């Protein structure tokens, strides 16, 4: 039957192949609905794409049939999804931008994923510790990483927090971390009363600088968190050497580095604890979720207990009620500080099948990036982080840098040069973002911990001020259409040539 939708005054009419669906007229004026969905009669759901507030772009509305009663956990099957139409755009450039932002649905789910989640719901195992699906996920993840003990968590932020607690970090202890990273890296120590101290980065890799790290180590430093930014490993040998000399624990934040290797070893296995995120924008996505990995079985058990309120989780040949104190069985007693940091079982089910194809997707992405890296090296004032012979880059994001020599050459500010290049890319359908800017010590929440460093003159600040991220920050690069990746190098060259000519003309 025909469906008519009014979207901010525009009318979209299309057909849903279900004869018993009455013809509804829906008005959508609230921008908060973009990216959400509307549930119709007979179980159809209309999924509305996310739109920028400042632009009227082509809209593709998807209809999905929900199977089962809505009040009993109805689920949808991807093979019954129907694309039902578009509304017109007022600008060709905006239309191209919207078209080029189309990506594979992410996470990339198969029918098996839907069936696994439905089976999880049917099993009734929706919460708790030591559940079968959680154990299966952890064992599968250990195999995929190639060693260690995996402990699941509710998020990457939770994983970092649990790791710090497990390593004995106390209120007032100092934790070193890079100035350029996502806020969660600094929030984790603050959540347990520790003090983050920021360390400058290497402007070529955007990872923490080992030299700056060595200079920042003082007697009150108890832990170091390194972040493998955008999918390439830090210089771990040098970092571990500095830490071990001082007896300092090291945590790897691997939120953007699923599949990344350093000298043949998977990141996360190179330190005391590796922490991973499974938020939607990651290579491995559960919507939200995370996990830790360590080579130390005692540390793994401690983290498992911390994730379960600090309660001892079941061990082999052990029963809670076997412990007797003052004539009473001790069934539940917190043995340490913890919280409810457990991974949701349905999230584990959602992720399990993704591992089967993740290496293949990463390999495709690495192949797609080779010509981009090579050709970008020929563009004046351009730079894209290259991989190293001793590590594997998994390209979570592409950060395009502009050499500061361009400022002197053109006599323009870096902000003007960067803005013009981004506009030129947008005209060719390539979106971009600044992602997290400014660097953390210049953000309001973290200024009290910035110390005496002039961060506006730091390598990290300058590196972020003269660069930007290509494509949508809410999706990993791996979610891009292959055709769009193939076109990217050409469009980057075209955008820069046009912008270069414009800047040169204005000299």
Swiss-Prot record:
Listed result of changing residue 74 to P: In strain: RM220-3
MF terms in GO: DNA binding; pyridoxal phosphate binding; transaminase activity
Domain of life where this protein originates: Bacteria
DNA-binding region ranges: 256-275
SUPFAM superfamilies listed in its UniProt record: NifT/FixU-like, PLP-dependent transferases
Residue stretches in coiled coil: none
Keyword list, A-Z: DNA-binding, Pyridoxal phosphate, Transcription, Transcription regulation, Two-component regulatory system
Pfam families reported for this sequence: DegT_DnrJ_EryC1 (PF01041), NifT (PF06988)
Keyword NADP: no
Annotated function: Involved in the biosynthesis of the rhizopine 3-O-methyl-scyllo-inosamine. May have a regulatory role in controlling the housekeeping genes within the nodule which are involved in the biosynthesis of the rhizopine backbone.
Similarity comment: Belongs to the DegT/DnrJ/EryC1 family.
The name this protein goes by in its record: Protein MosB
Organism: Rhizobium meliloti (Ensifer meliloti)
Gene designation: mosB
């Amino acid at each position: 039957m025909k469906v008519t939708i009014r979207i901010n005054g525009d009318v979209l009419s299309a057909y849903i192949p279900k004869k018993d669906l009455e013809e509804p007229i829906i008005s959508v004026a609230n921008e908060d609905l973009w990216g959400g969905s509307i549930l119709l009669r007979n179980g159809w759901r209309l999924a509305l794409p996310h739109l920028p507030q400042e632009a009227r772009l082509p809209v593709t509305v998807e209809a999905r049939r929900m199977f089962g009663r809505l009040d009993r956990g109805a689920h949808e099957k991807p093979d019954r999804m129907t694309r039902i139409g578009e509304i017109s755009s007022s600008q060709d450039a905006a239309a191209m931008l919207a078209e080029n932002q189309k990506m594979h649905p992410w996470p990339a789910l198969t029918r098996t994923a839907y069936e696994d989640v439905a089976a999880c719901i049917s099993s009734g195992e929706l919460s708790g510790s030591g559940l079968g699906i959680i154990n299966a996920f952890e064992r599968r993840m250990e195999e995929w990483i190639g060693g260690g003990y995996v402990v699941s968590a509710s998020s990457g932020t939770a994983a970092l927090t649990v790791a710090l607690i497990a390593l004995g970090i106390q209120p007032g202890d100092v934790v070193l971390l890079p100035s350029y990273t996502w806020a969660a890296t600094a929030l984790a120590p603050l959540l347990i009363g520790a003090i983050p101290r920021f360390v400058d980065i290497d402007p070529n890799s955007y990872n923490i600088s080992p030299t700056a790290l060595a200079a920042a180590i003082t007697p009150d430093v108890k832990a170091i968190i390194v972040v493998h930014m955008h999918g390439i490993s830090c210089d771990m040998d040098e970092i571990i050497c500095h830490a071990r000399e001082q007896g300092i624990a090291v945590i790897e934040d691997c939120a953007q580095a699923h599949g990344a290797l350093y000298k043949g070893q998977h990141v996360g296995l190179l330190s005391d604890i590796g922490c991973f995120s499974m938020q939607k924008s990651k290579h491995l996505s559960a919507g939200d979720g995370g996990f830790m990995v360590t080579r130390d079985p005692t540390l793994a058990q401690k983290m498992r207990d911390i994730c379960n309120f600090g309660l001892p989780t079941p061990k082999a040949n052990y029963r809670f009620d076997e412990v007797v104190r003052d004539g009473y069985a001790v069934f539940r007693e917190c043995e340490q500080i913890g919280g409810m940091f457990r991974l949701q079982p349905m999230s584990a089910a959602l992720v399990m099948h993704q591992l089967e194809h993740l290496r293949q997707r990463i390999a495709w992405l690495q192949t797609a990036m080779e010509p981009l890296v090579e050709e970008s090296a020929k563009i004046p004032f351009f730079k894209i982080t290259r991989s190293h012979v001793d590590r594997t880059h998994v390209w979570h994001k592409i950060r395009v840098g502009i050499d500061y020599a361009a400022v002197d050459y053109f006599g323009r500010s870096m902000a003007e040069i960067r803005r013009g290049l981004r506009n030129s890319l947008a005209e060719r359908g390539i979106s971009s973002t600044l992602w997290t800017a400014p660097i953390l010590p210049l953000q309001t929440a973290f200024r009290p911990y910035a110390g005496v460093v002039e961060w506006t003159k730091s390598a990290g600040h300058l590196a972020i001020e003269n660069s930007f991220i290509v494509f949508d920050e809410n999706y990993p690069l791996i979610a891009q259409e292959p055709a769009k990746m193939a076109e990217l190098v050409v469009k980057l060259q075209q955008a820069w040539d046009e912008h270069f000519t414009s800047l040169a003309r204005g000299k």
